[in-house]
Amino acid sequence: MGKAVNIEHVEERVESELMPPPMYKVILNNDDYTPMDFVIEVLQLFFKKNEQDATDIMLAIHNQGKGICGVFPFGIAETKVAQVNQFARQNQHPLLCSLEKA
């Protein structure tokens, strides 16, 4: 008739299926040429930061060499990095966006 099911095995499988995806930090790196106003624009346009948050992150980038724009699942982080880097190149700025595991 029916097949016996190992409850512990099912619970373990369900638990592993519900694991959240690995998260990645999207980072903007400082350079000596990109204007601060452009960095603020990028933060507002691609990361939906308000003016104060964008300014705070821009100052962190300027003073510490890099700043975290947000933490996202890999696919979203990868897309944002590509969008920001393309936007920077289109506007002739060397601003570099990268990602690292959170």
From Swiss-Prot:
Secretion signal: which residues?
none
Q: What Gene3D superfamilies does the annotation carry?
A: 3.30.1390.10
Name the domain of life this protein comes from: Bacteria
Q: Name one Pfam family in it.
A: ClpS
Q: Where are the transmembrane segments?
A: none
Q: Which InterPro entries match?
A: ClpS, ClpS_core, Ribosomal_bL12_C/ClpS-like
One GO biological process this protein is involved in is: proteolysis
Could you tell me what this protein does?
Involved in the modulation of the specificity of the ClpAP-mediated ATP-dependent protein degradation.
Assembly, in brief, is: Binds to the N-terminal domain of the chaperone ClpA.
State the family it belongs to: Belongs to the ClpS family.
Listed PANTHER family: ATP-DEPENDENT CLP PROTEASE ADAPTER PROTEIN CLPS (PTHR33473:SF19), ATP-DEPENDENT CLP PROTEASE ADAPTER PROTEIN CLPS1, CHLOROPLASTIC (PTHR33473)
Q: Which NCBIfam families match?
A: PRK00033.1-3 (NF000670), PRK00033.1-5 (NF000672)
Question: What HAMAP family does this protein's entry cite?
Answer: ClpS (MF_00302)
Protein name per Swiss-Prot or TrEMBL:
ATP-dependent Clp protease adapter protein ClpS
Give the species this sequence originates from. Shewanella sediminis (strain HAW-EB3)
